[in-house]
Amino acid sequence: MAVRPRIQLLDTVTINQIAAGEVIENAVSVVKELVENALDAGADEIEVETLGGGQGLIVVKDNGCGMSSDEVTLALKRHATSKIEEFSDVFSLSSFGFRGEALPAIASISKMEILSCPKGEEGSRTIIHGGEVIAAEAKPRQLGTTISVDSLFYNVPVRRGFQKSPQTNRIAMRKLLENRILSLESVGWSWISERQQEFHILKHQGLAERVAFVMGEGFMQEALRVDRVEEPIRIVGFLGSPCFHRPTRLGQRIFINDRPVDSPLISKQISEAYTMLLPPQRYPVFVLKLYLPPQWCDFNVHPQKTEVRILKEEFVREFLSESIGEVLARSQESSSYKKTSLTLPTLRFFDGQLPEISLEQPRESMSLPVTQLATPSIRSISSLGCQQEIPAVDTQTEIVWGESQEVRFLTSLGKIVLAEDSEGVHAIFTEAARKHLFYLSLIENQQEHYKSQSFLVPLCLEVTPQERVFLLSHIEEFKQLGIEISQIGPCVFAIESAPTFIGEEELKSWILSLAAESHTKVDKKAIALLIKESLTQTIFGKTLRTFDISWLSLLWQIGKPEKAFDGTLIRRLILDEDFIKE
């Protein structure tokens, strides 16, 4: 007979470790909580040091009010806090933390040391392992607190096994600290990662300087200043020029009452203001700080406090729409900005000038003698730009492919080409076919360098710190495609050469999009394929109106595939007349 389970109280360490599962996801969460504690202690100088992306060591030093030895002991107990006294205080918060859970939760899953000194006292040192205080002594220190966290998750091996790579943690940690740099202009920040200084921001540096540091000088050169008050609301910050946009929302920094938040409401409202100014599926870049009455905001939605409920949402929406709309309207009136469309160069896939069939020509039927063409191969597709003359095609000779297979070009119907072999009549979807052949050429040539041209003046590319890590990690993959990239500044790269089949502006836009969407991925092989797929999609993102009839031979050579690498339809065997009518 099974033993009846009995209800019992959990011990304090277990309770704190359970709480850590909600509050502390990784090393980045630890830095976030310790930094917020430092800010709530009134610090205006904060230094963060990390090793192994925080998995090895995290140290946060501040010059805040400090704690006495007794207060340190109390702070290690759950729900001990100096920030609220009763529940109603939650709805008028001026502090970043209030639950009193973070410090005991972190202490329960790590080896921690707290060195702290309040005004007029000597200071103390407390050592905690797995939530248990193992040593406490007097220790001199200047006003403030230093908290060191070592061996994170050492006593929770399951959690430790699910931690992300140090590189991923560093990327997330940088964004966390950048948000703090932007949100609090009166605080100086320093970050030392892997024993190297990442940045040092002085507390007297204003918002414009901080935005330039985080978002890049390129953003600030044409950024639009926002500063509007309609009591009791204020919005301040910088909007990106309409010519400065990204493929994702990663370039959007939103703060409410100096808290970095994820706010679909604000993001959507601002994106709508840019609707007529940006290309499709592109997003504006901005840094905006919204100040609302504390009683209008509920940050007690999630322990991470990155979500917020806004009480008078409709009023806030109208205020945002008017504020952003006015700034954008003024910028359009005072500038000569005009949207431009990129023009792709004509693409030729073979070592020669092959005949092309315009898909807008009248329908006609003809036989195509593949044997008289310079028989192409997948490997030859990447040889672009050679202009050699090819003998004219004899359109009356019947095609013989190999010894037993024959294929004939029949006619063109809009974006579809009809061809016939012994199996029947096939509809070839030209855009998908062309895209797939180009992609196969990239895969086939993965060990070779593509023919490229050097730029007389290298193209300058300004990226975010996250995108910088991605580019530095995959320089060799770009080089295999004939794209040579080098770093010339902290977040500035030079594109020195590139294949002739992609235009300069298209190239820059593609690299930025790829870096923005893929900076969290670390698998080298997956990234190499992703780069090739992404480049193919970029080049063939526009409607193409020509189709080399010699490409039919290539399609049959590779087994006349039905679908392209991305799942789009290339070929369909026509079984009845209804399909043609469709």
From Swiss-Prot:
SUPFAM superfamilies with a match to the protein in the record: ATPase domain of HSP90 chaperone/DNA topoisomerase II/histidine kinase, DNA mismatch repair protein MutL, Ribosomal protein S5 domain 2-like
InterPro entries per UniProt: DNA_mismatch_repair_CS (IPR014762), DNA_mismatch_repair_MutL (IPR020667), DNA_mismatch_S5_2-like (IPR013507), HATPase_C_sf (IPR036890), MutL/Mlh/PMS (IPR002099), MutL/Mlh/Pms-like (IPR038973), MutL_C (IPR014790), MutL_C_regsub (IPR042121)
Pfam families per UniProt: DNA_mis_repair (PF01119), HATPase_c_3 (PF13589), MutL_C (PF08676)
Keyword list, A-Z: DNA damage, DNA repair
GO (cellular component) term, any one: mismatch repair complex
Gene Ontology terms for molecular function: ATP binding; ATP hydrolysis activity; ATP-dependent DNA damage sensor activity; mismatched DNA binding
CDD domains noted in UniProt: HATPase_MutL-MLH-PMS-like, MutL_Trans
Superkingdom, taxonomy of origin: Bacteria
NCBIfam families: mutl, PRK00095.2-5
Protein family membership: Belongs to the DNA mismatch repair MutL/HexB family.
Function: This protein is involved in the repair of mismatches in DNA. It is required for dam-dependent methyl-directed DNA mismatch repair. May act as a 'molecular matchmaker', a protein that promotes the formation of a stable complex between two or more DNA-binding proteins in an ATP-dependent manner without itself being part of a final effector complex.
Protein's recorded name: DNA mismatch repair protein MutL
Organism expressing this protein natively: Chlamydia abortus (strain DSM 27085 / S26/3)
